[in-house]
């Protein structure tokens, strides 16, 4: 199974540790798929600063194909993070994606050929690839992480091109998850999965709804657990074509991620000059 993730990357800076960790939804899924034993590639835009150099080195160490990555002059994406007593992530602020916010990926013929050689493409709401989805879904099936974006206009725009739709839904009741799945299916998504933190996950395959409880873990840090769930599900389902099995693998992968800082480790000591603001926003 060959997975390609396209889009966002970031480093998550932990104020209390004065350390940043590689991350970003698309990059996390690429690395975690590789760790699960599958061929993996990543295409995205990085800067030319210390954070970008660390990301590129990590991709090399993890043996994720980064041959088609774009590097531009400017700062890499950085999110400033602290943790609460439960190990949940609280974002303090960010640089809005850094250089990624001022550029966009333009797919050339060689990119299209490279992407076509994979079995599945994963991207996210943070990757700004909505206009490219009609082309991409014609190459390989598309997985899309909507995070908490459930706006009807956005679902109508994206879902027609998506095979696997993932939502962060820890604030939703079970009935609200059902309504969201119904809407996403109505606009074209084939499978719709809502991850709900400690409440586990709900997946709708259209004709059947599946429930997956969490796998108990000693929690150090929950950052990246949702991305790990996605990587675990996609790789397992593409190999076995068994939803129940894939959900269990996803939950186990997410549990392991909760036992390390960052999505998959690789902390890099770094002193942020301004230290960030004190305003905090909890990410569900």
Swiss-Prot record:
Q: Which cysteines are joined by disulfide bonds?
A: none
Keyword ATP-binding applies:
yes
- Domain of life, per lineage: Bacteria
Q: Give GO terms: molecular function aspect only.
A: ATP binding; kinase activity
Q: Which CDD domains match?
A: Fructoselysine_kinase_like
- List the keywords (alphabetical): ATP-binding, Carbohydrate metabolism, Kinase, Nucleotide-binding, Transferase
Q: Which EC class is this protein assigned?
A: transferase
InterPro entries found in the cross-reference section: Carboh/pur_kinase_PfkB_CS, PfkB_Carbo_kinase, PfkB_dom, Ribokinase-like
Q: Give the EC number.
A: 2.7.1.-
Q: Does the keyword ATP-binding apply?
A: yes
Q: What does this protein do?
A: Catalyzes the phosphorylation of a range of fructosamines to fructosamine 6-phosphates.
Q: Which family does it belong to?
A: Belongs to the carbohydrate kinase PfkB family.
Q: What is this protein called?
A: Fructosamine kinase FrlD
Source organism (scientific name): Bacillus subtilis (strain 168)
């Amino acid at each position: 199974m060959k997975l390609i993730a396209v889009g966002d990357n970031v480093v998550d800076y932990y104020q209390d540790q004065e350390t940043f960790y590689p991350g970003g939804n698309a990059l996390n899924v690429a690395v975690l798929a590789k760790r699960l034993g599958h061929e993996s590639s990543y295409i995205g835009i990085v800067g030319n600063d210390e954070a970008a150099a660390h990301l590129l080195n990590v991709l090399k160490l993890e043996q994720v194909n980064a041959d088609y990555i774009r590097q531009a002059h400017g700062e890499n994406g950085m999110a400033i993070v602290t943790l609460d007593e439960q190990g949940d992530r609280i974002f303090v602020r960010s640089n809005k994606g850094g250089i990624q916010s001022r550029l966009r990926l333009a797919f050339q013929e060689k990119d299209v050929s490279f992407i076509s050689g994979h079995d599945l493409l994963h991207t996210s709401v943070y990757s700004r690839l909505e206009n490219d989805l009609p082309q991409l879904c014609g190459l390989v099936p598309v997985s899309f992480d909507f995070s908490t974006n459930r706006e009807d206009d956005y679902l109508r725009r994206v879902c027609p091109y998506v095979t696997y739709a993932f939502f962060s839904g820890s604030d939703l009741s079970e009935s609200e998850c059902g309504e969201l799945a119904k809407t996403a299916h109505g606009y074209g998504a084939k499978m719709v999965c809502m991850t709900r933190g400690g409440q586990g996950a709900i997946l709708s395959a259209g004709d059947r709804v599946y429930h997956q409880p969490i796998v108990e873990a000693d929690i150090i840090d929950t950052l990246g657990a949702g991305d790990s769930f996605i990587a675990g599900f996609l790789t397992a389902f593409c190999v076995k074509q068994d939803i129940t099995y894939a959900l269990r693998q996803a939950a186990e992968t997410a549990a392991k991620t909760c036992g390390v800082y960052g999505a998959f480790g690789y902390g890099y000591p770094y002193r942020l000059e301004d230290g960030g603001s004190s305003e905090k926003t909890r990410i569900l």
